């Protein structure tokens, strides 16, 4: 078992939601935003090195290419920089806390949030974990979730306990359009 030492991970500065990583001499711009991804990248690096020590042909360039190429669609995924749009499929308090931490560390302000939830998830805790992240939250009913989808009005009622401005929308597309019209600096 190889466990990376957290003190050996040296975060680097970059643009908002960029994740520069320095571990064991491997300096890479990770495609996975969020400092919570750096220990994961260190584990991946150690795993590749362990395989190399066992005779696998893995060179330093391959490790760096892997670190740069790793993706998790819809997990703090920047899909546009102008306008600034991030997609995150967090569906529980822990995922929401990771998103909130990443947004706060990036010092992103003036953001709008678009959110839909499943009725069987811990919606109130998830909303509380995102407190302070959005100047305005637009709620939607997830279109493909079937009977598990929490109605946009119900989500808005819960969200009003946490967010200063909440608007009910019919679809995510409507919410994104409205957020852009309202002039927010970015949308998550």
Model-derived segments and their meaning:
Residues 6-8, 116-118, 141-146:
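Short, acidic/turn-prone active-site loops that include or flank metal/cofactor-
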Residues 13, 36-39, 147:
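A generic short alpha-helical patch detector that favors 3-5-residue windows
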